[in-house]
């Protein structure tokens, strides 16, 4: 295994050169010290330190140290018990059951005696660990030690002498015998060391020129051991280079009708999938990659000029190292600076070209952006229930699959709850669709989505939609008529997606199912028919905003904030209960779900198809190219499927019928709201507590339990008596709900003041972090590129859901605007301008105007029925509009209010602005037409940042 080490003296400004050196050396193991600057210590973002293709182990105490192990090598983080700040450790299994313990250490030249003693103790501890091989690299800052004689002239009991003594007591071997630190014409010293527990462990130690302005050489060497390489072969299809004309001709020549007649749906699917995959292999170029070699290609920006400058830099340094002459040092500095300039120029030119082609090739642009701004980390070693560490990918996959299966519900088939009869206008027993309907669905597929377990690419289906619509229509029709899915459609590949918490714990991941794209296409037909049936029969609860056309997170939050502000304005305190289902999507009992669908009038072949969709499913988990064994799916609706979320919505649809409080739903996200009653103040049973008891009984009957430890209460109002609420856990024990002072709900932070200053602070901080990452990651920052990056990556953090939390405090307005102010100053050619002029030069509206515009768009959508909600609750129309001779026909009612919170909800703050808009704007025929008309009418406000100016028309 090849290893590389250097003292980098700040990572972010040398990353480009470091990647160049990594491409040149191709190391399996990388050790770095001083990865962050003295000024920015503790402020480095985790993504900043990522190197594609490597697993990183980082300790950012003081100046920081880092270890990088190639992804194809199994590695495990090791935590020492000795409290020495700047070290990082991991272990690698080797062949023949050997193991390698690797450490990187940084000892400051200003280290205290205690810190030096701790470092010596740490080394002793690691030597005593049960590993056959030990390798420690780092900057130890002991120029006083002569490593050729392993002696020092330093006084007895001094740090160098103590280190040497400990080194000999541990029977270590030090391999660096030439200077590693050159600062001008000062004396060169050996500061960087490589320590091992065997004399012949390393070979071909090479000293090369520093990276950037660092004074430390780069060391690379061969470790004489063989790591356990996890080679995974993956076949990649280059779908952008496919011969789709040839593929269409190939597929058109197949007599689909005769091939698919009088056979089972399983046989039909085998015929269709086999032919599509055969056509893919024939007409789409592909290549098989091995994970061990997949990251060895050079950076795309590296060109011949860069390579030539690097070569000159190497030659100049070699000459200086031999002569130590001042002239040669100056020539080296000049060559170093020219190489760095050439690299920057190459990166800048590449980024400029990427930006130019962003419109014609947005995929390439965002791939590059994501490579700079997102951390692509593999799943680390997991901690098993027994405390043991799980390192093998197949074993990890088994752990995940066992955990995901452990939450399945064992349904009580002996006792089913009673369901009240529901009057209905129609029943859903069959679905009619044509080949044209199937073709339209195929043409609307997202080509960038992943294929399912069958490996059929969405791009193939989209390109060949017209010809494949015929066989798929035959298959879909037969599947529906028989009420049976092809068996392959019921097999899911599960990808664990990290949520939050420790990455080493399996319960901190959620399962996402990758299923057949063709199956998802048919699911859309069933989903749309089911939703249409539920809405037409007025079965769907008005409180549900998730996965329903014309409703969203924003519409749900607008309703609850409007109700809270109404209660506050009327002088009432209120309480919110944030409910949390336990593994909601995975624990839905199948037979109870089918029972509910029957009660809603779903029957015939549609019900049988859904029954087949739910039952007899199985899943396996993939981790790093390794697969778990198959396990049966006993309950739940597949996360990642098209139909699953709607089935869940149907399952909990009756929950609001049993309670008196206001309830707000978004799929499995549920909140209860009610004003504080006189009974509560007097110590009696409140409406909320009664509803919680009812919901506990409902969850017990329908076997969909609440995670009571995550259910919380928020008390709103200055004189709120802060009552305690309880719920029963799965074992029937009462549990007092925790009080929360701030809660992130559907992406928006809510606090008892309902002024949203907390959300504004979170949004501004997140946007600022991303802005800093963009600033550090991109060399080329002209107006076009930065505007694209800002609009795509930063502004969404400042605007998500702003119709809900529209700030009205001056400090909050300024806090948000400062982020955009700071972003526009990053463009060198615009820094001299004032903020408003920069906005005009970039054609970038102020955030204050964007929020006002967003309010108007929300109002337009409500009044023109783009939302399937009653607009009179939030935005009541002026009933006298028809009698007025002035203004437009959609004027809003002006209502009185007492509190600033009430005055700032959408239905109050937008009234004057909306009512003063001309009729041709508010009656636009589409949302896009409204946006264009509004922007033209309000062009003079586009760059305004002062709130009072925004209300002028």
Regions found by a protein language model. Give the residues of each.
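Short phosphate/oxyanion-binding micro-motifs
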Residues: 1-131, 154-155, 162-163, 167-170, ...
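Metal-dependent phosphoesterases centered on the DNase I-like endonuclease/exonuclease/phosphatase
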Residues: 20-60, 117-199, 249-263, 268-270, ...
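Short, conserved micro-motifs composed of acidic
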Residues: 47, 179-200, 205-207, 625, ...
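Arg/Lys-enriched, amphipathic patches
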Residues: 100-103, 133-137, 141-151, 222-391, ...
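Active-site palm subdomain of RNA-directed nucleic acid polymerases
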Residues: 126-135, 526-544, 569, 645-675
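Surface-exposed loop/turn segments and immediately adjacent short secondary-structure elements
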Residues: 222, 226-228, 252, 257-260, ...
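Non-catalytic, peripheral interaction segments enriched in hydrophobic/basic residues
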Residues: 288-289, 295, 342, 351-358, ...
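Conserved pre-catalytic core of RNA-dependent polymerases
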Residues: 404, 430-638, 674, 787, ...
């Amino acid at each position: 295994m090849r290893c590389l080490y250097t003292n980098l003296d700040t990572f972010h400004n040398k990353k480009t050169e470091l990647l160049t050196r990594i491409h040149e050396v191709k190391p399996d193991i990388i050790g770095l010290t001083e990865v962050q600057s003295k000024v920015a210590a503790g402020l480095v973002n985790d993504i900043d330190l990522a190197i594609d293709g490597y697993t990183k182990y980082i300790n950012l105490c003081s100046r920081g140290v880092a270890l990088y192990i190639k992804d194809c090598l199994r590695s495990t983080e090791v935590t020492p018990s000795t409290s020495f700040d700047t070290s990082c450790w991991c272990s690698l299994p080797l062949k023949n059951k050997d193991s390698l313990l690797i450490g990187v250490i940084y000892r400051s030249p200003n280290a205290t005696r205690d810190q030096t003693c701790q470092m010596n103790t740490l080394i002793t501890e690691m030597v005593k660990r049960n590993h056959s091989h030990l390798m420690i690299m780092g900057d130890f800052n002991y120029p006083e030690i002569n490593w050729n004689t392993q002696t020092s002239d330093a006084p007895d009991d001094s740090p160098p002498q103590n280190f040497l003594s400990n080194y000999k007591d541990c029977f270590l071997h030090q391999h660096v015998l030439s200077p590693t630190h050159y600062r001008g014409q000062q004396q060169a010293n050996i500061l960087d060391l490589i320590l091992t527990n065997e004399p012949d462990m390393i070979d071909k130690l090479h000293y090369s020129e520093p990276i950037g302005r660092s004074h430390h050489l780069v060391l690379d060497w061969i470790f004489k051991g063989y790591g356990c390489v996890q080679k995974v072969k993956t076949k990649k299809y280059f779908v952008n280079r496919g011969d789709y004309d040839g593929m269409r001709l190939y597929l058109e020549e197949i007599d689909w009708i005769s091939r698919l007649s009088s056979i089972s749906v399983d046989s039909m699917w085998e015929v269709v999938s086999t032919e599509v995959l055969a056509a893919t292999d024939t007409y789409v170029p592909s290549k098989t990659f091995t994970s061990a070699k997949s990251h060895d290609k050079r950076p795309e920006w590296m060109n011949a000029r860069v390579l030539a400058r690097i070569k000159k830099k190497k030659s100049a340094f070699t000459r200086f190292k031999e002569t130590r002459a001042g002239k040669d040092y100056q020539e080296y500095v000049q060559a170093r600076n020219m190489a760095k300039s050439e690299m920057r120029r190459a990166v800048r030119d590449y980024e400029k070209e990427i930006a130019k082609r962003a419109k014609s090739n947005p995929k390439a642009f965002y791939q590059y952006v994501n490579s700079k701004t997102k951390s692509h980390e593999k799943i680390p070693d997991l901690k098993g229930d027994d405390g043991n560490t799980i390192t093998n990918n197949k074993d990890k996959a088994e752990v995940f699959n066992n955990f995901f299966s452990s939450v399945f519900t064992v349904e009580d088939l002996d006792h089913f709850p009673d369901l009240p009869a529901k009057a209905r206008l129609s029943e859903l027993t069959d679905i009619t669709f044509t080949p044209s309907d199937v073709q339209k669905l195929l043409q609307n597929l997202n080509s960038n989505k992943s294929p399912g377990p069958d490996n059929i690419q969405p791009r193939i289906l989209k390109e060949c939609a017209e010809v494949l619509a015929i066989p798929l229509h035959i298959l879909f029709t037969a599947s529906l008529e028989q009420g049976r899915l092809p068996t392959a459609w019921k097999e899911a590949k599960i990808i664990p997606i990290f949520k939050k918490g420790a990455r080493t714990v399996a319960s901190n991941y959620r399962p996402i199912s990758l299923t057949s794209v063709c199956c998802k296409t048919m699911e859309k037909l069933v989903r749309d028919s089911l939703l249409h049936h539920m809405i037409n029969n007025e079965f769907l609860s008005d409180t549900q905003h998730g996965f329903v056309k014309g409703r969203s997170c924003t519409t749900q939050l607008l309703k609850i904030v409007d109700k809270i502000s109404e209660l506050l304005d009327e002088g009432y305190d209120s309480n919110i209960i944030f409910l949390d289902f336990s593994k909601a999507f995975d624990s839905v009992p199948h037979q109870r779900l089918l029972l509910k669908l029957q009660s809603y009038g779903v029957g015939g072949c549609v019900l049988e198809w859904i029954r087949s969709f739910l039952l007899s499913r199985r899943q396996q988990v993939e981790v790093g190219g390794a697969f778990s064994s198959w396990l049966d799916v006993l309950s739940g609706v597949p996360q990642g499927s098209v139909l699953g979320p709607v089935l869940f919505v149907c399952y909990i649809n009756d929950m609001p019928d049993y309670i008196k409080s206001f309830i707000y739903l978004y799929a499995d996200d549920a909140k209860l709201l009610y004003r504080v009653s006189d009974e509560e103040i007097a110590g009696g049973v409140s409406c909320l507590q009664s509803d919680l008891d009812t919901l506990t009984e409902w969850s017990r009957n329908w076997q969909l339990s609440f995670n009571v430890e995550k259910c919380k209460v928020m008390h709103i109002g200055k004189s709120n008596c802060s009552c305690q609420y309880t719920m029963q856990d799965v074992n029937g024990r009462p549990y007092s709900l925790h009080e929360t002072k701030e809660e992130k709900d559907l992406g928006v932070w809510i606090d008892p003041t309902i002024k949203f200053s907390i959300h504004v602070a979170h949004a501004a901080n997140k946007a600022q972090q991303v802005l800093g990452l963009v600033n550090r990651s991109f060399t080329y920052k002209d107006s076009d590129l930065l505007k694209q990056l800002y609009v795509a990556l930063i502004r969404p953090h400042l605007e998500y859901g702003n119709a809900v939390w529209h700030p009205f405090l001056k400090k909050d307005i300024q806090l948000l605007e400062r982020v955009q102010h700071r972003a526009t100053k990053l463009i060198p050619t615009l820094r001299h301008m004032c903020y408003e002029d920069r906005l005009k030069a970039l054609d970038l509206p102020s955030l204050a105007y964007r929020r006002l515009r967003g309010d108007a768009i929300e109002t337009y959508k409500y009044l023109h029925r783009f939302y399937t909600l009653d607009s009179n609750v939030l935005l009541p129309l002026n009933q006298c509009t028809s009698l007025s001779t002035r203004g437009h026909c959609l004027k809003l009612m002006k209502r009185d209010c007492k509190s600033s919170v009430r005055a700032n909800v959408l239905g109050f703050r937008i009234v004057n602005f909306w009512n003063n808009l001309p009729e041709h704007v508010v009656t636009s025929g589409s949302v896009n037409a409204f946006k264009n008309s509004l922007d033209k009418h309000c062009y003079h406000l586009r760059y305004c940042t002062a709130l009072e100016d925004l209300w002028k028309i």
